[in-house]
Amino acid sequence: MSDDEREEKELDLTSPEVVTKYKSAAEIVNKALQLVLSECKPKAKIVDLCEKGDAFIKEQTGNMYKNVKKKIERGVAFPTCISVNNTVCHFSPLASDETVVEEGDILKIDMGCHIDGFIAVVGHTHVLHEGPVTGRAADVIAATNTAAEVALRLVRPGKKNSDVTEAIQKVAAAYDCKIVEGVLSHQMKQFVIDGNKVVLSVSNPDTRVDEAEFEENEVYSIDIVTSTGDGKPKLLDEKQTTIYKRAVDKSYNLKMKASRFIFSEISQKFPIMPFTARDLEEKRARLGLVECVNHELLQPYPVLHEKPGDLVAHIKFTVLLMPNGSDRVTSHALQELQPTKTTENEPEIKAWLALPTKTKKKGGGKKKKGKKGDKVEEASQAEPMEG
């Protein structure tokens, strides 16, 4: 196969090199999450935590593929966000922001890394206190974790996206929680964080997606967000939005000099992946970004909120649909949970959890170190899954 033909062929998991790049990106983002968690202490500034996560990813990816002839793009695939309590997502404030985390806060950490455009994302929920998590906080995290475990077992060749949407809603209901509307799980491809195959969190008349079947050698970002509230989050303040992605298919002649300046900087620095306004020349950024968003040159990732007092949990993971089964490559162990609800009397949920993630190989192929594949059904709902 000539180089040109190879370029044209879409790179997927049939290439061992591609699998390695996904797993390397996953290893880095898992470590970045661990680092940010270790820095989450009462009174820590959220912006400092976010910057530490991004800096670690940049440093670690920068050390890879240094000596190859062809330049390999690598770095942050989604800026580190830390969304607290009833804030649902995308909180990654500017350097001037003084918001801190407090004892007892429910922290949702979300981040992504890529190597050569092969993306690994992770989302995790942590309560900032010692000892087991109890009450409704434990319920909402257990609901999210159990839904993630069920999704892992249903995102497999032959199953449909609608199967996952229905199942995760049933899991959340068992814990008297709601899956949050508007959260999408996407197929990912090289340099594409939000591919065309989509899993809805909640199916309703307002949000329709094409029915799709999962196929071998695909990669998905599975994104589960659960709330003790009504699961219909609102945008409260557009000024909180700091994460954007360039819309590569749109063009417009910007009128303002500040907009042209900032869009030129974005096109050079962040042509494809989502980025944070923190990484732009901040004084001009605010002014220029508005016109870019108004004319759809940039897709904003808004900061959404449930009602005050609602608790929101988030788990996101990357899964590779390999020929021998599903390989969850990003995760982090949860704290001990003592939920008030259980799925003990939910045979359908128990049956989903009993599904294996790996297909049994004849003659037992080489096994990698401790993936908890087929044993999750023995664990309680509160048990974390380490990937």
Curated annotation (Swiss-Prot):
- Give the location of motif Nuclear localization signal in residue numbers: 360-369
- Which Pfam families does the record associate with it? Peptidase_M24 (PF00557)
Q: Which SUPFAM superfamilies match?
A: Creatinase/aminopeptidase, Winged helix' DNA-binding domain
What's one GO-annotated cellular component? nucleus
Tissue expression, per UniProt?
Expressed during tuberisation and in roots, nodes, internodes, petioles, leaves, stolons, tubers and sprouts.
Q: Name one GO molecular function term.
A: RNA binding
InterPro entries, per database record: Creatinase/aminopeptidase-like, PA2G4, PA2G4/ARX1, Pept_M24, Pept_M24_MAP, WH-like_DNA-bd_sf, WH_DNA-bd_sf
Q: Where is this region: Necessary for nucleolar localization?
A: 1-49, 297-387
Q: This protein's superkingdom?
A: Eukaryota
Region Interaction with RNA, annotated ranges:
356-373
Q: Region entry RNA-binding: which residue ranges?
A: 47-55
Q: One biological process GO term for this chain?
A: regulation of cell growth
Region of interest (Disordered), ranges: 337-387
What keywords sit in the KW lines? Auxin signaling pathway, Developmental protein, Nucleus, Ribonucleoprotein, RNA-binding, rRNA processing
Q: Where is the composition biased (Basic residues)?
A: 358-372
Main localization of the protein described in the UniProt heading: nucleus
Q: Where in the cell is it found?
A: Nucleus
Give the knockout phenotype: Growth retardation leading to small dwarfed plant and reduced tuber yield. Young developing leaves contains a reduced number of larger cells than controls, whereas at later stages, during expansion growth, the cell size is abnormally small.
Return the similarity comment.
Belongs to the peptidase M24 family.
- Please explain the role this protein plays, according to its UniProt record: Binds RNA. Associates with 28S, 18S and 5.8S mature rRNAs, several rRNA precursors and probably U3 small nucleolar RNA. May be involved in regulation of intermediate and late steps of rRNA processing. May be involved in ribosome assembly. Required for expression of cell cycle genes such as CYCD3-1, RNR2A and CDKB1-1. Promotes, in a dose- and auxin-dependent manner, organ growth by stimulating both cell proliferation and expansion, via the regulation of RBR1 levels.
How does the record describe its quaternary structure? Component of a ribonucleoprotein complex.
Q: What is this protein called?
A: ERBB-3 BINDING PROTEIN 1
Q: What organism does this protein naturally occur in? A: Solanum tuberosum
